[in-house]
Amino acid sequence: MKTIFYIALGGGLGSVLRYLTTLVINKYVQTTFPYATFVTNIAGCLLIGLFFGYLEKQNAVSPYLKFFLITGLCGGYTTFSAFSNENIQLLQSNQILIAFLYISLSVFLGLMATWTGLIIAKEL
């Protein structure tokens, strides 16, 4: 039960952070490309790399911190469902190039961000 509490707490915080990130990005960037979800997901990948890399080095850290940060916070912050829905909308509106770029950049940069986070965390 304690594990579920920490996941829920992190997930709630991550969801609020995603909402705030979306508000800020949409305030300054208005275009067909879904920048808010894109930036959120790439930032979430960097965070999960940082958290996982850091926690991997720490033996005395509570396992609940891992549930809070990785499963909860990062899980609540990033959003694969919005990514999928936005790509379907782009394809349905015949914006195939933008959908292709969004998918390709999200996967490539997401992997690079996670890897970068792991490297940074291991150097700390």
Curated annotation (Swiss-Prot):
The chain crosses the membrane at residues 4-24, 35-55, 63-83, 96-116. It catalyses: fluoride(in) = fluoride(out). The lineage of its organism: Bacteria, Pseudomonadati, Bacteroidota, Flavobacteriia, Flavobacteriales. The keyword Lyase does not apply. GO terms for biological process: cellular detoxification of fluoride. GO terms for molecular function: fluoride channel activity; metal ion binding. Na(+) is not transported, but it plays an essential structural role and its presence is essential for fluoride channel function. It is a multi-pass membrane protein. Belongs to the fluoride channel Fluc/FEX (TC 1.A.43) family. It is found in: Cell inner membrane. Its main location: membrane. Na(+) binds at G75, T78. Fluoride-specific ion channel. Important for reducing fluoride concentration in the cell, thus reducing its toxicity. One of its GO terms (cellular component) is plasma membrane. The keyword Heme does not apply. InterPro entries: FluC (IPR003691). This is Fluoride-specific ion channel FluC. Pfam families: CRCB. Keywords: Cell inner membrane, Cell membrane, Ion channel, Ion transport, Membrane, Metal-binding, Sodium, Transmembrane, Transmembrane helix, Transport.
